[in-house]
From Swiss-Prot:
The modification Phosphothreonine is found at T26. The gene is Csn2. InterPro entries: Casein, Casein_beta, Casein_CS. Residues 1-15 form the signal peptide. One of its GO terms (cellular component) is extracellular region. Keywords: Milk protein, Phosphoprotein, Secreted, Signal. Mammary gland specific. Secreted in milk. This is Beta-casein. The keyword Lyase does not apply. Its main location: secreted. It comes from Mus musculus (Mouse). PANTHER family: BETA CASEIN (PTHR11500), BETA-CASEIN (PTHR11500:SF0). Important role in determination of the surface properties of the casein micelles.
Length: 231
């Protein structure tokens, strides 16, 4: 029994020694780590201080080099330019008199060219003036006559009907005595010559006028009493 108690005491003593050694070792390790961390911080501070000092030295060199260079534009040492006043007794420069131009100046070459052109090219002939007799002859050649209706080989009743329509227009003759029909009658007669072959034989004057107004509304046909024409 005593032996067992002694063994327990020895074991407890050994356990205490091991815990003490372990704690001491951990304390030493933590102290070493803290020392290393402190050393690293010191090194970083030293490096930062060295960089700041190097930058300060560089800036000082640059500033000193800028101050040592001479100024490109020394305005302070610039001398004033002397300006002598112009004397008032100087006469103005004489200018040539201005002659007003009366028109474009033609060169001798252009004048000779125009003269040569006038001699080579013939002048245009003037158109003769038309007198009243010439105009009347031209109009008379274009105005149809009542005899032209008979040349269309129409029935006698239709020819008489067309003649009545022509005679219903006002008798406003031209100046010349050779014309037998007025201008309105000539227009109607020309129009009747175009439509006469297509008209029926038994037709009153009123029906014919209405038919002609439908064909040509631009011509104003006079109103005549309604009666038929027999052969």
């Amino acid at each position: 029994m005593k032996v067992f108690i002694l063994a327990c005491l020895v074991a407890l003593a050994l356990a205490r020694e091991t815990t003490f050694t372990v704690s001491s070792e951990t304390d030493s390790i933590s102290s070493e780590e803290s020392v290393e961390h402190i050393n690293e911080q010191k090194l970083q501070k030293v490096n930062l201080m060295g960089q700041l000092q190097a930058e300060d030295v560089l800036q000082a060199k640059v500033h000193s080099s800028i101050q040592s260079q001479p100024q490109a534009f020394p305005y302070a040492q610039a001398q004033t330019i002397s300006c002598n006043p112009v004397p008032q007794n100087i006469q103005p420069i004489a200018q040539p008199p201005v002659v007003p131009s009366l028109g474009p100046v033609i060169s001798p070459e252009l004048e000779s060219f125009l003269k040569a052109k006038a001699t080579i090219l013939p002048k245009h002939k003037q158109m003769p003036l038309l007198n009243s007799e010439t105009v009347l002859r031209l109009i008379n050649s274009q105005i149809p006559s009542l005899a032209s209706l008979a040349n269309l080989h129409l029935p006698q009743s239709l020819v008489q009907l067309l003649a009545q329509v022509v005679q219903a227009f006002p008798q406003t003759h031209l100046v010349s005595s050779q014309t037998q029909l007025s201008l309105p009658q000539s227009k109607v007669l020309y129009f009747l010559q175009q439509v006469a072959p297509f008209l029926p034989q038994d037709m009153s004057v009123q029906d014919l006028l209405q038919y002609l107004e439908l064909l040509n509304p631009t011509v104003q046909f006079p109103a005549t009493p309604q009666h038929s024409v027999s052969v």
